[in-house]
């Protein structure tokens, strides 16, 4: 009887073991099926917060292709354009706001004097005009905004907020007065330089060409003072590293980088070094990551994918914090775009990747729009506070500027000593 008893006990043990094993199967299946749905999470983020891109060159693309003519079917924005941006793709990309860049190139000769005769200011105003006319034409989908409250309103109404930025100080002739008029015309940020120096600052391209990084000029602080007074965003993309540092020492308001990435990840001078990222955090500013392949990976640009963009985003978030990173693709300003981010319709995929790499939904909301809206709101508040204090517009002019021949010698029309001695000089 004893052997039979042992056999029954063994059978019972096997049965218990089998039951235990089978009980694990549903648990394992549950683990497998609970994989996060990043697309659904990205959709939740995009539904709650406007995705605002810091830099898109569509106005320049229009200028180049149609000389600013948008009517009579010349620019079929509502159906399909050949570039990287049009209304259907913006909608597919779940875009909530766009800073439209108005861009006029620097002189082709790098030795051109700063105060060169130019039509750049005229051309800039014409691009502001075409950007605003495009928004008006498609007002069912786009809303022109010159303040962050309007940007939020546009999103609530299901429209794409449309804002304007100037891509280079040479476009206002190195003139604070001209900059002020561009602000009144609707521009809400100005990039201090493009790929040329001006009366205010040194450009990154100058340093790349082997010349010294002189940073901001003596005239530069006057510009920053006026931009702070106006409530205009100071954009430090394109400037040299020393210019970044110099501006951050004098500005009273947060700054933006409308389309730059992390220098520690890719040693391109258009990117932002870590010491500057830390200062941007103290300044409460934002660095909006660009997608230009040669900036993202200077050593192997052809290999760049969406994962490389995510790497820049996470580096900036690690050094400066999630409150200080945003997005500035540079669509229609480059042909160098990563696999997976070929046009503006691909933004949801980027947000999925950011979440997949470990960002929370709260962090993703900051990235796509909350940060730039916070910065813009603070810049606007600081401007109003400065104006309410009685601060007058800055009148300072660059000492190296050329005056027309009739103005090279000051008239005594405004008397400094004797009110009886007036010289009109225009008879």
From Swiss-Prot:
Pfam families according to UniProt: Peptidase_M19
Binding site for Zn(2+) 1: 55, 57, 167
Signal peptide start-end: 1-29
Keyword field: Dipeptidase, Disulfide bond, Glycoprotein, Hydrolase, Metal-binding, Metalloprotease, Protease, Signal, Zinc
Family that this chain belongs to: Belongs to the metallo-dependent hydrolases superfamily. Peptidase M19 family.
Protein's UniProt name: Putative dipeptidase MCYG_02918
Function text: Hydrolyzes a wide range of dipeptides.
A GO molecular function held by the record: metal ion binding
Originating species: Arthroderma otae (strain ATCC MYA-4605 / CBS 113480)
Cofactor(s) the protein requires to work: Zn(2+)
Record lineage: Eukaryota, Fungi, Dikarya, Ascomycota, Pezizomycotina
Glycan-bearing residues: 402
